[in-house]
Amino acid sequence: MKMLEQLEKKLGYTFKDKSLLEKALTHVSYSKKEHYETLEFLGDALVNFFIVDLLVQYSPNKREGFLSPLKAYLISEEFFNLLAQKLELHKFIRIKRGKINETIIGDVFEALWAAVYIDSGRDANFTRELFYKLFKEDILSAIKEGRVKKDYKTILQEITQKRWKERPEYRLISVEGPHHKKKFIVEAKIKEYRTLGEGKSKKEAEQRAAEELIKLLEESE
């Protein structure tokens, strides 16, 4: 329970129903019945709304062509992981199999905010203000800097073209999970080098696989 209290202190919110917080932090490998997946489904919508609302309010350019790449970054696993670091969220996740990766941290981050929303009596305004209290400055900084998601597939292709004058290949390995929460696993390969990436879409999984292959190629130099 002390661990939960530490997280509550970082959040600035004390849960009335501690089991909600525990559920938000629990991976399906730890508990088949009480895990975060349904909360993550709700939290995805909540967090996306909070962030996109700020983006539309504070962006210096309101054109869709400018907003879309910013939005893609701001609601990405990469950015959610940066925000989650402020809470040291990885320390509180309960998991039995596998390692805690960016996908799991991103999912738990979303589930956590759904748990706050439900525990507060489904008070969206309260939840949004708490979220902004913690993360508004980080979001506004990203908007001001015009941060966009890195295109790892393009970066990888530039590396392989330069080294071998060849393009990497991508292969869909599997699609897992229910319809509302599919997980795509993709293999990226060039010569004898192969890596896997996973994501909520094939495109995202390809980007993750490309990122891992870049790391592998850098290590092999």
Swiss-Prot record:
Annotated EC: 3.1.26.3
Keyword Protein biosynthesis (UniProt): no
Thermal activity characteristics from the UniProt entry: Optimum temperature is 70-85 degrees Celsius.
Keywords in alphabetical order: Cytoplasm, Endonuclease, Hydrolase, Magnesium, Metal-binding, mRNA processing, Nuclease, RNA-binding, rRNA processing, tRNA processing
Cell location: Cytoplasm
Superkingdom assignment: Bacteria
Binding of Mg(2+), residues: 40, 107, 110
Function: Digests double-stranded RNA. Involved in the processing of primary rRNA transcript to yield the immediate precursors to the large and small rRNAs (23S and 16S). Also processes some mRNAs, and tRNAs when they are encoded in the rRNA operon. Probably processes pre-crRNA and tracrRNA of type II CRISPR loci if present in the organism.
Family of this protein: Belongs to the ribonuclease III family.
Cross-referenced PANTHER family: RIBONUCLEASE 3, RIBONUCLEASE III
Protein name as catalogued: Ribonuclease 3
Lineage: Bacteria, Pseudomonadati, Aquificota, Aquificia, Aquificales
UniProt gene name: rnc
